[in-house]
A protein has these predicted regions:
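Short, surface-exposed beta-strand-loop junctions and turns on beta-sheet-rich folds
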Residues: 31-32, 110-113
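Structural signature of nuclease core domains in nucleic-acid processing machines
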Residues: 98, 107-108
Length: 207
């Protein structure tokens, strides 16, 4: 049990921030989750952006990509890294590079970078650094972009402090998913009210 390897998706950090108990019910207890209209719309928007990107994309190597001083962009970059008995998986919505830095961008229909969203993007930054550590010679920036209007909601240089905060969150989530730690349910009844598990969750505050 102590050496159990746990798979964690980068997007799970946002879910855990919403409610660890909900994530536990879905990922460990495997209770079915019905896709909402918002989830379906999000998938369609991402697919549309990817298809638009493919039409104009020019092949290049990762070495050329990270050395570029002109703005270059890739989309739907899938990465994984194994450490601390965790297989971390992630798909970066948009990865860009210019002379000043590398930009790890997530598209969401949000106008505020909640901590769960930031941890998700830091997960992508962590994956990027561990997959391309020999190629990255520029600062890495975490970016949240509004999916609908394209405006940048949040942009911040990825630092050692962010990495430390992310790693602590990853180890906590590892212990929740391996059932070494009890998940913490939300204390916000508004979250319970919109949760698909509110009829079966013993901690639900929905009335």
């Amino acid at each position: 049990m102590n050496n159990q390897t746990v798979v964690i998706g980068a997007s799970w950090f946002q879910e855990a921030s919403f409610c660890e108990q909900k994530l536990y019910l879905g990922k460990v207890k495997r209770l079915p989750l019905i896709k909402t209209e918002a989830m379906k719309e999000g998938a369609l928007v991402h697919e549309g952006k990817y298809q638009d990107f493919v039409k104009s994309a020019e092949p290049t190597t990762w070495e050329e990509f990270f050395k570029s001083e002109q703005l270059v962009t890739s989309r739907e970059v899938e990465l994984q890294h194994i450490s601390n008995n965790v297989v971390l998986l992630g798909r970066i919505d948009e990865l860009s590079c210019d002379r000043d830095g590398i930009y790890v961008t997530d598209d969401k229909p949000n106008d505020y970078a909640y901590i769960g969203i930031r941890k998700q993007i830091w997960a992508y930054c962590h994956l990027l650094e561990n997959n391309f550590k020999d190629l990255i010679q520029k600062p890495v920036y975490a970016v949240l972009k509004n999916r609908d209007n394209g405006e940048i909601v949040w942009k911040e240089k990825y630092t050692g402090a962010h990495k430390e905060q992310f790693l602590m969150a990853m180890l906590r989530l590892r212990d929740v998913l391996s059932e070494k730690r009890k998940p913490e349910p939300t204390k916000n009844p508004n979250k319970c009210a919109v949760c698909q598990y509110n009829k079966v969750c013993e901690f639900s505050l929905a009335k």
